[in-house]
Amino acid sequence: MRPTARKIGKWTAELLLVFIGAYAAFWLNSYQERHRDAQRRDVLLASLEEDVRGSIGVAHERAEKLGQDAAAFRAKVDAGEMPPLYPFVFITDYNPTDVATLLQAGGVELLDPKTLAALRKVESRVRAWLGLMERYQKLSDQLIVPNVDQGPEFFYDPATKKLRKRFEKYPQSLEDAGKFFEEFEKLEKELLQQIQLERQKHK
């Protein structure tokens, strides 16, 4: 073999080794990255599942309690009893910004599009409901809180024993508070199902 041919052969072999080494390093890097992503995804989904399970339990209890309270109030009004009006106070542990934080922490890259869609659906509906609850609370602060010591005649027409016009939304506010938790429970159950499907898929 000519010296030039030997040099070309040696150079080709060295180049091939370099290529194989680079490819192996790339493959190992890629494998390690996929493994890390899988671990992060599993931790993220496990944490999310735990939070959602807790939310479902709380939402169910509150929906039941608020629904009963609203029905009892409506029944008393219908019976002409003129029950007292209390300040409307709406409390929920849900914070829509938690979803944004989750997505910024890598959720967008790691989670299945269907899981992300379920998360965003919960966030969107909750924001709409919270806006309504905020309006009810403002009305309560303006109309009920300053007059909480007033007698029933202030809130009801004594002749008809029906709520005066400016207080007519009060029973609806109680009912809507219960409906919020009913829908929240339903949406969280759908989200939980999707989380479990994704965890099963990546086992």
Please report, for each region that a protein language model flagged, where it lies by residue.
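Short hydrophobic membrane-inserting helices
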Residues: 1-13
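Transmembrane signal-anchor/signal-peptide helices with a preference for the extracytoplasmic
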Residues: 19-43
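Membrane-proximal amphipathic alpha-helices
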Residues: 34-45, 55-63
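Interfacial alpha-helical end/capping and short helix-turn segments at domain and membrane boundaries
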Residues: 1-2, 50-203
